[in-house]
Amino acid sequence: MLAAASAQGPGGPGAGLPRGGMQGPGGPGGPAGAPAKIKPYAEVITKDAKSDDGLFMTHQVDEKYYWEIPADKLGAEVLWVTTLDKSPTFYGFGQTEVQDRVVRFERRGDKILLRSVTHTIRAEDPAGDMTRSLLMAKVEPIIATFDIKTTGNKDSVVIDVTNVYTGDMAEFSAKGSIGASRMDASRTFIDSVKSYPKNIEVKLTATFVAGGGGSPLGRRGGDGPSRDSSTDAITVGLHHSIVSLPDRPMMARLADSRVGWFSTSHFEFGTADAPVKTITVLDRWRLEKKDPRAALSEPVTPITYYLGSEIPAKWKPYVKRGVEEWNAAFEKIGYKNAIVCRDIPTKAEDPEFDQDDVRYTVIRWLPSGVENAYGPHISDPRTGEILNGSPKIFHSVLKLSNNWYFAQVSPNDPRAQKLPLPESLQGDLLAYVVTHEVGHTLGLPHNMRASSTFSIKQLRSKEWTEKWGDESSIMDYGRFNYVSQPGDGARLIPKLGPYDYFAIEYGYGAIPGAKTPADEVPALKAIANRQTQNPMLRFGNQSPEDPTRQSEDLGDDSVEATRLGLKNIDRVMGYLVKAAAKPGEDYEILAEAYNTVMGQRGMELRHVLAVVGGMIENNQHAGQGTQVNYTPVPAGKQRAAVRLYNEQLFQTPAIMVRPDITRKFNPSGIADAVLASQSGILSGLVQDSRLKRMSEQEALTPKSAYTVANLFDDLRTGIFSELVSAKPVVDLYRRNLQRTFVSTFGGKLTASGDGKSLARQTLVTLRGQVKNAAGRAVDRATRAHLHDLLKAIDDQLDPKVSAGGSGAPAGAFPFPR
C-alpha cells in the first residue's frame, strides 16, 4: 500500500466544510439535528440526469453528483486511490499516487457511513473465539456520513458525493503532496465521472491555496522554475479511483527474511494461550497457469504493462524491451509470456480505455528535471495481491544514465567517449532503468548485497558477464561495470542475475497441492535454503557497516574494485575536454561532466569506508551451517583500505588539481574541492560507531584485530608523511588536510570510549613530531604552518594553557611524545 499523507488537524484544509454533505446548519442534510427526508427517486434523479452504470450507478444532476449503491455492495470493501494527474510547471510532474485507502459503505438507519478499513489485526481462525473477541473490541473509523437522498430498485441507496471531492476530505487529499494549506472549493470543479463494472473513475480540476509547507512532489534539485509567488493558487488535476477488491482473495504467500520482497504485515491472534504473531506476506501479482499440468504454460491473466501515450516514440521499443526482460525469469518457473508490454489501445480499439484508470498498469513518462525513476505498486491489504504497478520514468533519467555511463565505463566503450551518447546506447541504458523499476512493481526491493557477490576476476570476464552481467541482481544499485579494464571485453550494463531468477521462483513459482499459505512453507524454505551453498542468491538491505551491502558498488573486494575504478577515472580525465567541450559553445556540459566524474571518484572511495571496522552479515537461519551471522572484516583487508586512502586520497590526487580543465568554467575552488573529498572520508573513518565496533573486535580477538590504535597510527603516518623528511615541505593541499586532522581528532576528545584516550595520545605524539620538523622546514609557508599546528594541538589538548591559564603544561600526559 502507498503511504497516506498526514491527517488533517483542527482548522486545517477543509475546516468548516460539511463532511460528505452531512454536518452543519443549512447543509445538504438540512438544519442541525433535523432528520433527512428521503425523497421519491424521480425528485432526486431527475429526467435530466446523466447516468452511468457500473460498480455503482453514478448520476449527474446539474452540478451535483450522486452514487447509487446497490444493497449487495453495502459492506463490501473497495480501494480508493487519489492520484495527482496534472500539475503546474513548477511542480515538475503529475501522474503520481498521493493517497490510497480501503473503505466500505454501511447503512445505519437513513444514513450511509463511510468507514476506513484496516487489516492489521486478525485472528488465525476466522470462525474461532478470538475472531469474535476482535469483532467485539474493534471499531473502524467513520470518515464521512451521508444522508440517503432516495432509494432505487432492489433497495439501492442514493447519496450526494459532491462534497467528497470539492470539500477536500483529509483521507483522500493531495494537499500534503503539493505543499498546500487547503483546497478552495469555489475554484474546484468535477470534470468527469465514469463508472465501470469494477471501478469508478473521477477527474477534477482542484485549486489549492499555497502555504502548507513540506516538500511538494517533484520539487527536487534542478527541477524547473520556482512557484509563481505572485499568486497563492495551485491548480492541479486530481484523479480518484474507487476499485472493487477481488471477489476471490488470492492465496497469500508467506515472506522469508532471507528473500527480499515488498510485503504486507498484520498481527495475528491464535489460540487463547498462544502469543500474538506478526504475519508477513509477499506483495505479488496473481499469476496462475492456464494449464497447471504443463511444464510451460501461458498465464490465465498475464501481467500487462501499457506504454503511456506521452512516452516519446523513439524510446518505446527500449521501454518495451526493458519490461519484457523479466519473461526469462518467469519461463524458468513454467510461465510463457507472463509479462506483456503493449501500446495503449486506440479509441477505435477500445473507446472506454483510460490510461489514468487504476485497473491498468501504465508506464508513465514524466516531464521533469528530476533525474530518477521509480516503481510503485498498490496492493490488496488482505492478501498482498498487487492490483496496480505503474512505473514512473522521469525524462531527465536519460541525462543521469548518460553521465554515469560516461564517468564509469567510457574507457571500455569507444561509443561513450563523446557526449551526448549515441541514441542506440541511450536506449540500452533506458531499457536497464526500466527493467530495474519493473522489478519493483513485481514486488522486489533493492538487494544491496547483489553487487558484492561477483569476484573481481568474474567482473573482468567476458564470458561471465555476458551470462550474468555485473551483479547477481538487477535490483541492486551496482550500476555499470567500472571494474572492467580496457581490453577485458566484459559486459558493462547489468542484466537479470541469479538472484532475480531465485526471487521470482520464491514469489511466483507454483507449489502443487498447497491449499493454504502454511502448506507452502516446506517448499519455500527449501528454495530459500539454497543460499547456503550459493552466496549469489543472498539478499541484504543497505548497511553502513557492511562492505558487502553498499550502494553503487561492485565486486567482492571493495579495495581492489576501487583501485581499478580509479584507473578508469584517470583515463576519462584524459579525454574529458575533447568529449564534453563543443566548439562554439560554452563549457556547461564540460562542467557537468567534470562534476560527474569527480562525484564518481568520491563515491568509489566511499565504498571502502565500510571495510574499516566492518561487520559482514550472513542472514541465515538456524541449521543452515553457519555458526554466527556476523563476521568482522579481516584485519588485513581493513589495513589495506586505510592504505588505499593514504595513497589515493590523502596524498593530494593529481587528477583533482587540473586548472587546465576547471578554469574553463570556474575561477577557483580546487583546494576546497580537494579538502572536501578528504575531510568527509577522514571524519567517517573516526566516527564513534566505527571506533566502538573496532574496540569490541579487539576485545574479542586481540591477536587478530585491526585496532583503533592501528587506525590512528596509520592515518597519522600517512597524512603527516612529510614530517620525516630532512627538509619537510608541506604544500597547500596537505596543509589544509593536516589542519583538518588536528581539528577532527580534537573533536574526539569529548567522545566516550577508547576513541577519546587514543585520540589524545595521537595528538600528543603528533605534537612532538611537528615540533621536531618545524626547525627543519626551509620554506616560510611550511614553517608557519607547522608552528600554527603546534598552537592548534595545544588548543585541543588543553585550552586553558593556550589561553594563558594555570593548567598543566601542554602535552603533560602519560603518553610518549
List each model region and its residues.
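Sec/Tat signal peptide C-region and signal peptidase I cleavage site
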Residues: 2-7
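Auxiliary tRNA-acceptor-end handling modules of aminoacyl-tRNA synthetases
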Residues: 8-65, 69-311, 329, 333, ...
